[in-house]
Amino acid sequence: MKIIILCPHFAPDTAPTGTVMTGIVEGLVDRGHEIHVVTSLPWYRDHQVEEEWSGRLTRTETTEWGSITRVHPFPSGDKRNLLRRALGFIGFTALVGITAVRPGGWIRKVDAVLAMSPPLTLGLTGWLVAKLRRGRFVFNIQDVVPDAAVRTGAITNRAIIRAAYLLERLSYRCADAVTVLSDDLADNVNAKLESRRSPSTDVAVIPNFVDNNWLAPVDGSPYRDEFGLGDGPVVMYAGNLGYSQSLDLMIALAEQRPEITVVINGDGAMRDVVTEAATRLSNLHHIGYQPAERLPEVLSAADIHVVPLRKGLGAVSVPSKTYSILAVGKPVIAAIDEGSAVARLLADANAGVSIPPDDVGALLDAVDALVGDRKRCEELGAHGPQWVADHASPAAASLAYEKVLAGEQTG
């Protein structure tokens, strides 16, 4: 098949969704498909276009399997400025739509167009490109954006909320297929399509995946040594510092357990809050994003990882970092809604524990239990790599995406 992919990030950009889409592309290429990616210039690490990529609105490179076209993302230096971020998404989306008519031959027919959300704005753009290129349109949902933004209070303007939900419904209805990461997300999308869905619309569940040949436990502690984390117990959160994450739990843990080293890796809208806390708490370390190739080393540095998602978001978001943590053999404490996809995953893998979201006491008890029982902590962590190999391999995900893109029934 000839496939066009529209996504916000792609290697060498360090965003988690970029890692996911890069893996999808590599898997499809291994299966013999011609791929043309339209994405942003790398910008995620410092929220500005990286110096070696700056100076042009677009850049195109030819690959052995197709091409990569990168366009300016118009990033906002302040992730809390939602208006500026929205305008940046609109500008990026417009450039993606304009440039996507060229890869693989000017407006030549393709077999399928795959667009990733967030940003939600790529939905209708993907549909328009698919119409122009006479291909099937598949909408890939990583997070149900309007729901998450509304529930965290990131968006409060009623007009903007109505517009976001309208755009979401239109994007779903225009798609030939929608892919989601869990049954919870599938239920969410199906409910919004109810009574208005096209008979041809398919909602397929394809969990994210990790390359466990690369993302594997790292012996030793080079990351600990580099950042002075010591030899004692280390509890880590690694990922986006956004409104959806209950980072106050990590700060409270550092405040109430001074004997434990607490590490928050990443960047985002809540960076200033985390940085301020780290200046007053000697056992709390804030470390910025590291190069993607260091991920196995970073995740292996912790004894315990925390995946904190605010109450009500468990059904609309599946933190892909969970798979990465399991791959390096570390146990997870998930502060997340009961019965959510991540809670079920940890129970199935026997690789961690789930606690109620936003509950400091529950987190303290869970950390105390694992720190106090090193054998159980190591046993839970040891279950992760095998579960990933059995359930979250790139090969299985690539086959599933191939079927959806080809129009085979998967839902």
Roles of regions detected by a PLM:
Residues 362, 369, 376-390:
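A short, well-ordered alpha-helix in the C-terminal region of glycosyltransferases
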Residues 1-62, 252-255, 411:
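N-terminal subdomain of nucleotide-sugar transferases
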Residues 190-194, 209-226, 246:
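Acidic anion/phosphate-binding donor-loop and adjacent secondary structure
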Residues 245, 289-300, 305-326, 331-344:
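Nucleotide-sugar-dependent
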Residues 210, 229-245, 251-255, 263:
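Conserved donor-binding/catalytic core segment of Leloir-type glycosyltransferases
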Residues 41, 184, 206-209:
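Carbohydrate-associated surface elements
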Residues 232, 263, 271-296:
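Nucleotide-activated donor-binding/catalytic signature segment of Leloir-type glycosyltransferases, i.e.
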Residues 101, 121-124, 128-132, 158-178:
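Membrane-proximal helix-turn-helix segments that form the acceptor-binding/catalytic region
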